């Protein structure tokens, strides 16, 4: 008769030992999440509904920049100097930039409005073709972007943005090579209007 209580005691001790071990296994903290990816070197400006913010622009395009070869996307390489005597619209963008994607349709409408005029529309991505080539190609398959497209190397991006590390940015250059307008960000309903006004100003500038 004495063996029965002893067996019950052993069973109870075993249960007490197993339950906390089992609990520890269930509540063991999960592994920490993977490290967040490194952010792109330029930051997308948030979308707004007021006029785009003007930037302090360079007075003229430097000679070194105009003569600098630009690696084209899907076409022959070119230089800004190739379009001397024409109005230049230069848009800096990236495939990961949401405001850039939403800005493109407005700019495309403007480009079509000035078809046949002495206006050249150039879109330069700030991404690195060695690492981002496939992503940029996928982006361009999803959007209608009729600009002459190319890759802005670090020196060109730094000079065109005048040191401000944000995109999208847009510059309008008159036929004499003077930058008459420069702004960053995408403003819903405003960016296209502002671009139209800047181009008209550049075309009529004496």
Predicted regions and their residues:
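Sec-dependent N-terminal signal peptides
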Residues: 1-23
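Conserved redox-active cysteine motifs that mediate thiol-disulfide chemistry
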Residues: 92-109
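Short, internal strand/loop/helix patches
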Residues: 137-169, 173-175
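N-terminal "domain-start" segment that seeds a small globular fold
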Residues: 27, 31, 38-80
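Thiol-/selenol-based redox modules, centered on thioredoxin-like
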Residues: 169-206
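Thiol-based oxidoreductase modules, predominantly thioredoxin-like and allied folds used
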Residues: 118-133, 145-154
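Short pre-active-site segment immediately N-terminal to redox-active cysteine/selenocysteine motifs
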Residues: 86-88, 92-96, 128, 166
């Amino acid at each position: 008769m004495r063996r029965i209580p002893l067996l019950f005691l052993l069973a109870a001790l075993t249960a007490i030992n197993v339950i906390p071990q089992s609990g520890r296994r269930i509540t063991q903290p999960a592994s920490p999440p993977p490290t967040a990816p490194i952010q792109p070197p330029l930051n997308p400006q948030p979308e707004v509904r007021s006029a785009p913010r003007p930037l302090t622009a360079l007075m003229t395009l430097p000679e070194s920049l105009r003569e600098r070869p630009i690696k084209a996307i899907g076409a022959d390489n070119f230089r800004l100097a190739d379009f001397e005597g024409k109005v230049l619209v230069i848009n800096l963008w990236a495939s990961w930039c949401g405001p850039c994607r939403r800005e493109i349709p407005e700019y495309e409408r403007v480009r079509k409005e000035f078809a046949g005029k002495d206006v050249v529309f150039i879109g330069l991505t700030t991404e690195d073709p060695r690492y981002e080539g496939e992503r940029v190609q996928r982006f361009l398959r999803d959007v209608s972007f009729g600009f002459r497209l190319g890759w802005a190397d670090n020196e060109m991006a730094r000079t065109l943005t005048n040191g401000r590390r944000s995109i999208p940015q847009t510059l309008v250059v008159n036929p004499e090579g003077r930058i008459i307008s420069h702004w960053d960000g995408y403003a819903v309903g405003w960016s296209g209007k502002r671009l139209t006004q800047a181009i008209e100003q550049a075309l009529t500038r004496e």
